[in-house]
Amino acid sequence: MVKSVGNLADFEAELKAAGEKLVVVDFSATWCGPCKMIKPFFHSLCDKFGDVVFIEIDVDDAQDVATHCDVKCMPTFQFYKNGKKVQEFSGANKEKLEETIKSLV
């Protein structure tokens, strides 16, 4: 299941709750074409990687999180372990998204 996070406090709580698990964060917007294109694939990865926490953040609804995480374009994927960012990339690249997850779990 992909969790939607709407503010910075919830985002930080999710990172803390995940502990040592990998957290994959999708920063997107409803008006972003590439974001819409990759969203079903992002959701499908939940089934493939059961021990990974998946979070989606709408940058328009959660501007505080986008600013805190220094998101400049959409979609941006950030990867966290133990509350710290370990990887990041921008763009709707399905192969890169899956390969990055595989390399970090």
From Swiss-Prot:
Residues at the catalytic site: 32, 35
GO terms, molecular function: protein-disulfide reductase activity
Cellular location(s): Nucleus; Cytoplasm; Secreted
PROSITE patterns: THIOREDOXIN_1 (PS00194), THIOREDOXIN_2 (PS51352)
InterPro entries: Thioredoxin, Thioredoxin-like_sf, Thioredoxin_CS, Thioredoxin_domain
CDD domains, A to Z: TRX_family
Role, per record: Participates in various redox reactions through the reversible oxidation of its active center dithiol to a disulfide and catalyzes dithiol-disulfide exchange reactions. Plays a role in the reversible S-nitrosylation of cysteine residues in target proteins, and thereby contributes to the response to intracellular nitric oxide. Nitrosylates the active site Cys of CASP3 in response to nitric oxide (NO), and thereby inhibits caspase-3 activity.
Protein's name in the database: Thioredoxin
Organism name: Gallus gallus (Chicken)
Gene name for this UniProt entry: TXN
